[in-house]
A protein has these predicted regions:
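Amphipathic interaction/junction segments at domain boundaries or subunit interfaces
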Residues: 47-139
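Short terminal or interdomain "cap/linker" segment that borders an active site or interface and mediates
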Residues: 113-132, 137-139, 152, 156-181
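A broad structural signal for alpha-helix termini and local helix breaks/kinks
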Residues: 17, 29, 58, 151-154
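Long amphipathic alpha-helical segments
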Residues: 21-57
Length: 181
């Protein structure tokens, strides 16, 4: 798991729930001696253990937490990688280019050992996208949250038209992006 996600999870938890909740979550996950640095890679179980602990502390469902975090994390990530994102993009352009521009150029080139999910996006009709998430991790709801976060960042909203678990680590969403009212 890329440290940038883990570091932002800490910021998300402290922003939404407070420092004491983060301290409790980190303790329950058994990671009190680990400071997640954005440029490092960590075992996948770190995120899973933190989310499981957060679920226990908040009483919220894992999928809801992942989706909320996905939406929350997009603005800081876009700001972090702003130089790689053309200013003229909207949410559709961002999502259509996320695999090549973000996962390939930013993550895999800088960290060849990194194994981010593969996120293939294609436009089925104007402003209707099929988003296919492929990963050995069960984090597809984090990806869906990111779709919501991208839309919100660009002043748009998302309507989920379809959601299906294809097999194992593959999940497909069909979404419509619309300007926010």
């Amino acid at each position: 798991m890329h440290g940038v996600i883990l570091a932002h999870l800490r910021h998300f938890v402290t922003d939404r729930y407070g420092q004491s909740v983060w301290d409790d979550v980190n303790h329950r996950a058994g990671l009190t001696d680990c400071l997640h640095v954005p440029i490092q890679l960590y075992p996948d179980n770190h995120l899973e253990d933190l989310v499981t602990a957060l679920q226990s502390v908040t009483g919220l469902h894992r999928d809801d937490l992942l989706e909320e975090f996905g939406a929350w994390v997009i603005p800081p990530l876009i700001n972090m990688y702003r130089a790689m994102i053309p200013r003229e993009w909207d949410a559709v352009a961002f999502l259509l280019n996320v695999e090549e521009r973000i996962h390939q150029r930013v993550i895999r080139l800088k960290n060849p050992e990194a194994t981010p999910p593969r996120i293939d996006v294609r436009e089925l009709e104007p402003r209707v996208l099929q988003v296919e998430y492929r990963s050995h991790r069960d984090l597809s709801l984090l990806a869906l949250g990111c779709v919501h976060g991208v839309a919100a960042f660009y002043g748009e909203k998302v309507e989920i038209l379809e959601s299906e678990q294809v097999d194992g680590g593959v999940r497909r969403f069909v979404v419509r992006l619309e300007p926010a009212a």
